[in-house]
UniProtKB/Swiss-Prot annotation:
Family as reported in the entry's similarity comment: Belongs to the polypeptide deformylase family.
General function of this protein: Removes the formyl group from the N-terminal Met of newly synthesized proteins. Requires at least a dipeptide for an efficient rate of reaction. N-terminal L-methionine is a prerequisite for activity but the enzyme has broad specificity at other positions.
Binding-site positions, Fe cation: 91, 133, 137
InterPro entries, A to Z: Peptide_deformylase, Peptide_deformylase_sf
Protein name: Peptide deformylase
EC number of the protein: 3.5.1.88
Keywords on record: Hydrolase, Iron, Metal-binding, Protein biosynthesis
Organism lineage string: Bacteria, Pseudomonadati, Pseudomonadota, Gammaproteobacteria, Enterobacterales
Active site: 134
Species name: Edwardsiella ictaluri (strain 93-146)
Annotated cofactor note: Binds 1 Fe(2+) ion.
Keyword Iron among UniProt keywords: yes
Length: 171
């Protein structure tokens, strides 16, 4: 397994629409395993393949406190959604930034697991929010796209400052 490089906003590759996985092969399973390793190393709760410059419809999630409830969603489809829940979201691709985003409170999804078996999942709360957030990545969308242009611009400026500080620290 390997820790992959996470793309950061405003990298345009984050805007790429992911393509469906046609067959769950050992290579796809390796990508899933690398994505989990990356997500845990970055202390995230979810990761879409788009975020690591792999433009296939693959998501990994683990919202458990003990980091022992892995969820793999390959080719996820949102079947149902209702209610509204607002939560302050963050993102590994938008470091150190958080914002309130409103999403469906209850969802039902269909996807393939790591072995290529189809399943359906009805969920709510943090897991429902996380699934929707990661599915957005597969469509080239970021949580900051739900914000006003002014708030997005402020986040962009903060990130540019952060990236400059990080670059100076490395040199």
């Amino acid at each position: 397994m390997a820790v992959l490089q996470v793309l950061h906003f405003p990298d345009e590759r984050l805007r790429t629409i992911a393509k469906p996985v046609h067959e769950v092969t050992p290579e796809i399973q390796r990508i899933v395993d690398d994505m989990f390793e990356t997500m845990y190393a970055e202390e995230g709760i979810g990761l879409a393949a788009t975020q690591v410059d792999i433009h296939q419809r693959i998501i990994v999630i683990d919202v458990s406190e003990n980091r022992d409830q892995r969820l793999v969603l390959i080719n996820p489809e949102l079947l149902q959604h209702d209610g509204e829940a607002g939560i302050e979201e963050g993102c590994l691709s938008v470091p150190e930034q958080r914002a309130l985003v409103t999403r469906a409170e209850n969802i039902k999804v269909r996807a393939l697991d790591r072995d290529g078996k189809s399943f359906e999942l009805e969920t709510d709360g943090l897991l429902a929010i996380c699934i929707q957030h990661e599915m957005d990545h597969l469509m080239g969308k970021l949580f900051i796209d739900y914000l006003s242009p002014l708030k997005r611009q402020r986040i962009r400026q903060k990130l540019e400052k952060l990236y400059k500080q990080q670059a100076r620290a490395v040199n």
